[in-house]
Amino acid sequence: MAKTLAEKVWDAHVVRKGDGAGANAQPDLLFIDLHLVHEVTSPQAFEGLRLAGRPLRRPDLTIATEDHNTPTLDIDKPIADLTSRTQIQTLRNNCAEFGVRLHSLGDAEQGIVHVVGPQLGLTQPGMTVVCGDSHTSTHGAFGALAMGIGTSEVEHVMATQTLSLKPFKTMAINVEGTLRPGVTAKDIILAVIAKIGTGGGQGYVLEYRGSAIRALSMDARMTICNMSIEAGARAGMVAPDETTYAYMQGRPHAPEGADWDAAVEYWNTLKTDDDATFDVEVDLDADTLEPFVTWGTNPGQGVSLSQAVPSPEDFGDENAKAAAERALQYMGLEAGTPMKDIRVDTVFLGSCTNSRIEDLRAAADIIRGREKDPKVRMLVVPGSARVRLEAEAEGLDRVFKDFGAEWRFAGCSMCLGMNPDQLEPGERCASTSNRNFEGRQGKGGRTHLVSPVVAAATAVRGTLSSPSDLDPAPASAAIRTDAA
């Protein structure tokens, strides 16, 4: 029987088969290969184990890092916020008690959990990966079936190394063509979400396919899979290939020698069969894609940067019209305003979507030798301590500092309002993160989701801008099209 990539990985992990479809059907029981843990969604799960007198079933398949609440300045000092400090210390205590490997603040491998897993070679093709975080879909870039789970499910995986799930439907996102200079993976996924909506992928695993996807680097593929959840999907995947293997080989937890050869032989089978059928297929033309930016308060409210803020009257559906009216009011925007006329106060380069080394390189290439708009504050937050060290070895930190940007330590930072890096009410931010909800970056903060190169160009001009808007514009060869 012909199978999709998602179906192959799913079937390989079924411990106990359910009893079919339907609302009352029993789910399948899946084995979980890798469980990623952080400080926010794990305390209750560890406490559940403790109260039940249960051990952690597989400490060797569990890894923790501190990311959501960690400060990105003065990391050698006590954390000022009591709640954040308590959550961090609780994670440390729990990991010590249950034997979980932990990368703490100050550790060379500390960072955002979805950056740390891949960089250590823990995330591998064909795996099932879970974490108490919705952006676990990031790891699907390796051909893994990776899902965010709730705290009760976190406890279940800790206790049993399994998870009960009903099979998902499958959706192919076919992206053919060649991206133009200044158009990146972030623009692909923002365009996908704008096309199918924030609920279009509900109940599906999305598989990203086509020539434009195959041309992308692993960092870029992770950007796309990361935001699958913003389309409502449970997971996003890309079939592994030579690009995947080149990224993985030599990483600390990647197979070696004969084990590597055997692994690659298996990984090469992890592709959708030619005669397999998806439940839904969506097509996107990479040749015509432009830099994308959100104007509203959900990731589906986006347009090409060359366009204007839409009018609520442009939406035929009454619910969409009402949502647009509320979004415009919250964002302080008027319909018809050219997106490139919108001035920002802050530019944030970071998050599990766009904080990897290629993201930093791409942004640095745009700003090198230029001056920052004096009214704009720019924060650059590497996704991990390892990425930070790599960037500093390449001199990227000096490029950002010379430009006038703040060079920070690793963490989730301004992606979400759970640490000191937050927007003030009414402050407008061009952000490389994944969510632009009301208050996401701080109470009353206004967020526009953009790619790293758009973020960099915006920091130069002070208004939402693409690299081609700069004077002089960067040479086409200097703008990466395979990056995130």
Curated annotation (Swiss-Prot):
Presence of keyword Metal-binding: yes
Gene3D superfamilies, per database record: Aconitase, domain 3
Matching CDD domains: IPMI
UniProt EC number: 4.2.1.33
Key words, A-Z: 4Fe-4S, Amino-acid biosynthesis, Branched-chain amino acid biosynthesis, Iron, Iron-sulfur, Leucine biosynthesis, Lyase, Metal-binding
Co-factor binding comment: Binds 1 [4Fe-4S] cluster per subunit.
Domain of life where this protein originates: Bacteria
One Pfam family matching this protein: Aconitase
BP term (GO), one: L-leucine biosynthetic process
InterPro entries: 3-IsopropMal_deHydase_lsu, Acnase/IPM_dHydase_lsu_aba_1/3, Acoase/IPM_deHydtase_lsu_aba, Aconitase_4Fe-4S_BS, Aconitase_4Fe-4S_dom, IPM_dehydratase_rel_enz, IPMI_cat
Cofactor(s) listed: [4Fe-4S] cluster
GO terms for MF: 3-isopropylmalate dehydratase activity; 4 iron, 4 sulfur cluster binding; metal ion binding
Class of the enzyme per the UniProt entry, highest EC level: lyase
Catalytic activity: (2R,3S)-3-isopropylmalate = (2S)-2-isopropylmalate
Residue segments, region Disordered: 463-484
Low complexity composition bias: residue spans: 464-478
Functional pathway: Amino-acid biosynthesis; L-leucine biosynthesis; L-leucine from 3-methyl-2-oxobutanoate: step 2/4
Quaternary state and interactors: Heterodimer of LeuC and LeuD.
Function per UniProt: Catalyzes the isomerization between 2-isopropylmalate and 3-isopropylmalate, via the formation of 2-isopropylmaleate.
Designated name of the protein: 3-isopropylmalate dehydratase large subunit
Originating species: Pseudarthrobacter chlorophenolicus (strain ATCC 700700 / DSM 12829 / CIP 107037 / JCM 12360 / KCTC 9906 / NCIMB 13794 / A6) (Arthrobacter chlorophenolicus)
Gene: leuC
